[in-house]
Design a protein with these regions (language model features):
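Conserved P-loop NTPase
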Residues: 119-154
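Switch/coupling sub-region of P-loop NTPases
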Residues: 3-122
Length: 154
């Protein structure tokens, strides 16, 4: 997926451990995050806020977890053409459940109905690639279901 990024896109990469390279992209900004409170570290949420000030074309985030799940979903819904993120899940479809539970655990997520969170996820995320040991195991892509979520026909 990352190799398909156009060389002239503004790409912001948010990582807790450096794993991602996009050498073919001219304007790539790397931001490191970690456990907030440690000297020299900012939280993933702080990194996302800083990222949004840079007018990203694409936002790549590794290890989506904690409160950052809600912030990342909001970032993807602000008119950017897309993003790539990683999280731990048991399958491609289970990634939606995992992210949904992460969002539900946030202060804002606790006020939202889980079905609304899931509808937002399915209407925002186009493709999920499930990998094990750096090999593709499964790909989720269901544009018809996405359109049902977008149109509210579920």
């Amino acid at each position: 997926l990352l190799k398909s990024l156009h060389k002239d896109e503004r790409v912001i990469i948010l990582e807790d451990v450096h794993e991602v390279t996009v050498d073919h992209v001219v304007e790539a900004v790397y931001m490191m995050y970690g456990d907030a409170g440690k000297i020299g570290r900012v939280s993933a949420t702080d990194a996302l806020r800083a990222c949004m000030r840079l007018t990203p074309g694409r936002i790549i985030m590794t290890e989506l977890r904690d409160d950052a799940a809600w912030d990342y979903l909001k970032a993807l819904n602000t008119g950017h053409p897309g993003g790539v993120m990683s999280t731990h899940a048991n399958s491609a479809r289970d990634a939606f459940n995992r992210i949904g539970l992460l969002i539900k655990a946030t202060p804002i997520g606790r006020m939202l109905d889980m079905s609304d969170i899931m509808r937002m996820l399915y209407s925002t995320i186009d493709v999920v690639v499930h990998m094990e040991k750096r090999k593709i195991k499964e790909i989720y892509f269901d544009p018809e279901y996405k359109m049902q979520c977008v149109n509210g026909s579920l």
